[in-house]
From Swiss-Prot:
GO terms for cellular component: membrane. The chain crosses the membrane at residues 5-27. It comes from Oryza sativa subsp. japonica (Rice). Its EC number is 1.14.-.-. The gene is CYP734A4. It is a single-pass membrane protein. Expressed in roots, shoot apex, leaf sheaths, leaf blades, internodes and panicles. It is an enzyme of class 1 (oxidoreductase). One of its GO terms (molecular function) is monooxygenase activity. Its cofactor is heme. Belongs to the cytochrome P450 family. PROSITE patterns: CYTOCHROME_P450. Induction: By brassinolide (BL) and dark treatment. This is Cytochrome P450 734A4.
Length: 538
């Protein structure tokens, strides 16, 4: 009797689980398709389990199989977001796609974007990234939610105040000047010019700045750890390419084992470093410390110090500090490297703007024979600022971002229950295609796919027909905390290089922007650097 009851219970449990699974992967997607279709929102049909992923992968593979046409080098949207470009022509700017059985509503109208990130932000949360992505970016500010995110943001924000970042300028400037001197020597030995893949070399500049910002007086120890993190990123990036292979990250392949070992070593190194700094035993007085005290005043707030001193009532746990350090390294390095890469490529493509930017740099900062650009020079480089903004418009580091509805909500109708809005059920994901908004001719005019920094002459808010048409670092409370550091690094680096070199595209350069988490050149960015003759400063 008891045996029969147990069997019946097991059968009922199995039927219950089967019904839940069937609802999740079949009936719920069908209901949601009908729900959105009833509001005029359509999209490619849902396919059992895989959703639209197969079509998305095919569209992206076809688009990236060939480089950009020379006649329209900056019309990158059809290549970079091929699925969006293709389906938008069929379904309009707001349509429904499926990532497996998960619905994603694409939203590219600025007023709806305003609601998602500003006026209705409490209804949306950042979606949970894939574990491979989280291994790359760390479990820090980028992925945290709720009170923990708010606490971390509050603790770390002083590290990105302008006065604090300005103290990094001499260090970053010397790092870039040293890099430029290496290129000059290579050019002199190579007949007056040198070919450089800036996509690789700029990583060193970005690493220098983010290591200084994160570790301050513990720079040397932090640099060792971050070099391990750079190796880990290479392995994790390869794993990300196989993200659609179920369970791949758990397989004990040689590279996965090396990746796991590096992750453990990084954590041990950061824990030791945090322990020394927390103990205040002076153990971090390495060879860099005296230099930092001489050249970077004691008022500098490095991010590690801010976390250690997070407050007596709510000290940040060591594990949280470790994750934040990983986040700083990934986000700080990749965002700045990509911005610098695309900016130099664009100046090499457009020598007229390169000449305008150089004239401004020489007028404000002097030439390479004088002092390096200072914190007082950087705000005066208006043309360079316009060029960087146009770079971020055409080639934003993150081409899209995703939010998740925490509860049922209405967008576009002025509030829940209002006619004309789109009713969005809880757990629906919303994909905001940043690059598509940046390339929308309705917002930017008929030259939206052309390089024209002059559109930013009156500031970013007035560059387009809508003030929220330019969102390279996101919007609202979760806007990228490090955007000021990225712009400072980019301005300073470009100023130093323009003082010293003329830039041109290498004959081997192939214009092929592509996405692997962030936007980067698929075949690298080889450029020709020709040293300039120093002229007397005015």
């Amino acid at each position: 009797m008891m045996e029969a009851v147990a069997v019946a219970a097991a059968v009922l449990l199995l039927l219950h689980v089967a019904a839940r699974v069937a609802d999740a992967v079949w009936w719920r997607p069908r209901r949601l398709e009908a729900h959105f279709a009833g509001q005029g929102v359509r999209g490619p049909p849902y396919r059992f389990l895989v959703g639209c992923v197969r079509e998305m992968v095919a569209l992206m593979a076809e688009a990236t199989a060939k480089p950009m046409p020379p006649a329209a080098p900056h019309n990158a949207l059809p290549r970079v977001l091929a699925f969006y470009h293709y389906w938008r022509k069929i379904y309009g700017p707001t349509f429904l796609i499926w990532f497996g059985p998960t619905p994603r509503l694409t939203v590219a109208e600025p007023e709806m974007v305003r609601e998602i990130f500003l006026t209705r932000a409490e209804a949306f949360d950042r979606y949970e990234a894939h574990p491979v992505v989280r291994q790359l970016e760390g479990d820090g500010l980028v992925s945290l939610h709720g009170d923990k995110w708010a606490h971390h943001r509050r603790v770390l924000t002083p590290g990105f105040y302008p006065d604090n970042l300005n103290r990094l300028v001499p260090h970053v400037g010397r790092s870039v000047a040293a890099l430029a001197e290496r290129w000059r020597a290579m050019a002199c030995a190579g007949g007056g010019e040198v070919e450089v893949d800036v996509a690789e070399w700029f990583q060193a500049v970005a690493e220098e700045a983010i290591t200084r910002a994160t570790f301050g007086r513990s720079y040397d120890s932090g640099r060792v750890v971050f070099r391990l993190q750079a190796r880990l990123m290479a392995f994790a990036s390869e794993a990300f390419r196989k993200v659609l292979v179920p369970g791949y990250r758990f397989l004990p392949t040689k590279k996965n084992r090396m990746s796991w070992g590096l992750d453990r070593e990084i954590r041990r190194g950061l824990v030791r470093l945090i322990g020394r700094r927390s103990g205040g035993d002076g153990g971090e007085e390495d060879e860099t410390t005296t230099e930092l005290k001489d050249k970077q005043d004691s008022g500098f707030n490095d991010l590690l110090g801010l976390m250690i001193n997070a407050g007596v009532d709510r000290t940040m746990p060591v594990e949280d500090m470790v994750e934040e350090c990983k986040t700083f390294f990934f986000a700080g390095k990749q965002t700045t490297t990509n911005l610098l890469t695309w900016a130099t490529v664009l100046l090499a493509m457009h020598p007229d703007w390169q000449d305008r930017a150089r004239r401004e740099v020489l007028a404000v900062c002097g030439d390479a024979a004088g002092e390096l650009p200072t914190k007082d020079h950087l705000p005066k480089l208006k043309t360079l600022g316009m060029i960087l903004n146009e770079t971020l418009r055409l080639y934003p580091p993150a081409v899209a971002t995703i939010r998740r509805a925490k509860f049922d909500v209405t967008l576009g109708g002025g509030g829940d229950g209002d006619a004309g809005g789109i009713h969005i059920p809880r757990d629906t994901e919303l994909l905001v295609p940043i690059m598509a908004i940046h390339h929308d001719a309705r917002l930017w005019g008929p030259d939206a796919a052309q390089f024209n920094p002059a559109r930013f002459a009156s500031g970013a808010a007035r560059a387009a027909k809508h003030p929220l048409a330019f969102i390279p670092f996101g919007l609202g409370s979760r806007m990228c905390i490090g955007q000021s550091l990225a712009i400072l690094e980019a301005k300073l680096t470009m100023a130093v290089l323009l003082q010293r070199f003329d830039l041109a595209l290498s004959p081997t350069y192939v214009h092929a922007p592509t996405v692997l988490m962030l936007l980067h050149p698929q075949y690298g960015a080889p450029l020709i650097f020709r040293p300039r003759q120093s002229q007397p400063s005015n």
